[in-house]
Amino acid sequence: MRSWTEQSVCGRIFYLHMNGLISKDELNVMSERLRADFALPPDERKRIVKDRIDEILDILIMQYIYGNEDANEMLGINVDWSEQIGTEGTDTPGTEPYRVDTNRMESVINQIVADKTWRQRVEDWYASDNGTPDDIIRIIETESHRVYNDSILDVGEQADKETGGVYKTWFTMLDDRVRETHEYLEGETVPYKEKFHTFDGDSAMAPGGFSDPQNNINCRCAIWLTRQ
């Protein structure tokens, strides 16, 4: 059973993640651009794929930043990385720059999954006769989810090094769209360094990190960090 604090804050995180981190308006704008792109022949699409990749990269950077912010709130700490990057809103008077470990962020965003990076998958679909806008949207949503949760892991790792005793709990969306393998993990708490293990033999440090890509696509789960 989730505590009131876990339920309320997780609800906020889920709401932000599903309705704010990638807003419907943002996805609608991207979908319109993608539809225009995929109306072109593959040879012409190759000329504009870099623009879309840059736009997707901006989205993933924000996912990493949001994950850092939420993880700090979960643990009641402020992991202050040595590097900082400029992002939207940092020119506003009185607003501090977002601070993240840029090396960690780049490593997470550029992670190879099933032998390819997200960039390579986007390029493949743009070069394919069978590519569709939905294929790219699926990449954006899946990668955003992975980057967000991996960002939370990065803060958890740093906190565990500093104080020890960091644990993580797996939470699902508690609806009929949740996979049975993920429902199996609902509420499970493990030490930060351990993996979550499903009944089908797969495992992950966090949602979006399973060995089987089919366990990652369209996943909406999240982790909650605590110190004990």
Please describe what each predicted stretch is.
Residues 1-147, 151-155, 159, 163, ...:
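N-terminal leader/targeting and assembly helices and adjacent pre-domain segments
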Residues 134-228:
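Acidic, glycine-rich two-metal-ion catalytic cores of nucleic acid-processing enzymes
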